[in-house]
Every structure is written in structure tokens, then in C-alpha cells.
Swiss-Prot record:
InterPro entries: Ribosomal_bL20, RIBOSOMAL_L20_CS, Ribosomal_protein_bL20_C
Cited SUPFAM superfamilies: Ribosomal protein L20
Function statement: Binds directly to 23S ribosomal RNA and is necessary for the in vitro assembly process of the 50S ribosomal subunit. It is not involved in the protein synthesizing functions of that subunit.
Gene Ontology CC annotation, any one: ribonucleoprotein complex
GO BP terms in the entry: ribosomal large subunit assembly; translation
Protein name per UniProt: Large ribosomal subunit protein bL20
Similarity annotation: Belongs to the bacterial ribosomal protein bL20 family.
Keyword vocabulary terms for this entry: Ribonucleoprotein, Ribosomal protein, RNA-binding, rRNA-binding
Superkingdom of origin organism: Bacteria
Length: 125
């Protein structure tokens, strides 16, 4: 039986790493050892940033909602409290999209939230 020298396997692994490192700058794109490190670091960043993206979008939706409800004389926290008391269960993404694309419908939601709040809280805003 012939001896297996694993040249094909090594070549395939190297090719896979270099393909992933395509577009990198300097030796990171064509030196196996450095490219492998760069690709691994890139994957770490990708994993971390998939988590961060969720946080960033939630923060963006909250900022948009805060700006939109302030036009109606409320703050974000009072608005969310009013929604909870009114029994309206809509996520922040949907509310944010509603505020941007359907201002009339969003106004109706804000009015329902205002109505569910105690009178002095709605006046204080």
C-alpha cells in the first residue's frame, strides 16, 4: 500500500484559509500563518458583532421612538409604560417603523398610551 503524504490535504486547507483572507492587506492575504491568524481574528469579530448588532438596532429603535413620542408630548419611558398599561404588545422595531412610515397610525397608538397613563403623568410631559 502506498504511503500517504497529505500534500493534497494541506494544499486544500491552505487554499481554504487564503480564500477566506481574500481582500486583506499586505502579507495577511498571502502568507498562510499570518492569513490564518487574520481569518481567525475576523471570525471572532464577526461573532462578537453579531451580538452587538442586536444591541445597536434596539438602541436605534429606542432613539427613534423617543424622538417620535416627544413630538406628541411624552417621553420614551412614559410611552412604554402607557403601552404596557393599555395592554398594547408591539415590539420596538415595529413601533419605530410605524413612526417613520405611518405617522397617523403611530399617533393613534400614542394617544391610546397617553389615555392609559394617570392624568398627572400625561400633563407633566
Amino acid at each position: 500500500m502506498a504511503r500517504v503524504k497529505r500534500g493534497v490535504t494541506s494544499h486544500a486547507k491552505h487554499k481554504k484559509v487564503l480564500k477566506a483572507a481574500k481582500g486583506y492587506y499586505g502579507r495577511r492575504k498571502n502568507t498562510i500563518r499570518i492569513a490564518k491568524q487574520a481569518v481567525e481574528k475576523g471570525l471572532q469579530y464577526a461573532y462578537r458583532d453579531r451580538k452587538n448588532r442586536k444591541r445597536s438596532f434596539r438602541a436605534l429603535w429606542i432613539q427613534r421612538l423617543n424622538a417620535a413620542v416627544r413630538e406628541h408630548g411624552l417621553t420614551y419611558s412614559r410611552f412604554i409604560d402607557g403601552l404596557a398599561k393599555a395592554g398594547i404588545v408591539v415590539d420596538r422595531k415595529a413601533l419605530s417603523e410605524l413612526a417613520i412610515h405611518e405617522p397617523a397610525a403611530f399617533s393613534a397608538v400614542v394617544e391610546k398610551a397617553k389615555a392609559a397613563l394617570p392624568a398627572e403623568t400625561a400633563k407633566a410631559a
